[in-house]
């Protein structure tokens, strides 16, 4: 009889540990998904130097620390790109040290987006590739501050 109780206790402990580990896995997967980065590709008019992307969610959460946002990297055929967090729902494209910019552009959260900026700073949005250029894989960027005497 004692052995039977011990088996039940061990079975319950095993079941509880499985439940806890599965909760951890689900939480980790959700966190990883919320940190997923989505490509934003932009075509700007001639004369828009050093274009940048400012991005935020409807709840006011900013994707970047400060204006003018993330500088776009050259792609091909006059296109530029950057990555934004999957929660982004609004984008402003600006350039020439923020002297020119679009209005806020509503985009679908979690979808790669292609934005074409016209000469009058209006923008059109597409969720289908507008260039044959291959977007490089996301690589996290961070600032390193160093003191060198």
Residue ranges and their predicted role:
Residues 36-44, 142-146:
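A short, amphipathic beta-strand motif
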């Amino acid at each position: 009889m004692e052995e039977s109780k011990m088996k039940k206790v061990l079975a319950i402990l095993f079941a509880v540990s499985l439940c806890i580990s599965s909760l951890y896995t689900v939480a980790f997967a959700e966190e990883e998904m919320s940190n997923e980065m989505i490509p934003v590709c932009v075509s700007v008019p001639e004369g828009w130097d050093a274009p940048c992307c400012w991005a935020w969610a409807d709840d006011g959460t900013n994707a970047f620390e400060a204006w003018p946002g993330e500088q776009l990297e050259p792609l091909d055929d006059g296109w530029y790109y950057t990555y934004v967090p999957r929660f982004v729902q609004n984008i402003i494209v600006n350039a020439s040290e923020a002297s020119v910019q679009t209005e806020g552009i509503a985009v679908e959260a979690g979808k790669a987006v292609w934005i074409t900026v016209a000469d009058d700073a209006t923008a059109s949005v597409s969720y289908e590739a507008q260039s044959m250029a291959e977007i490089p894989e996301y690589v996290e960027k961070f600032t390193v501050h160093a003191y060198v005497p």
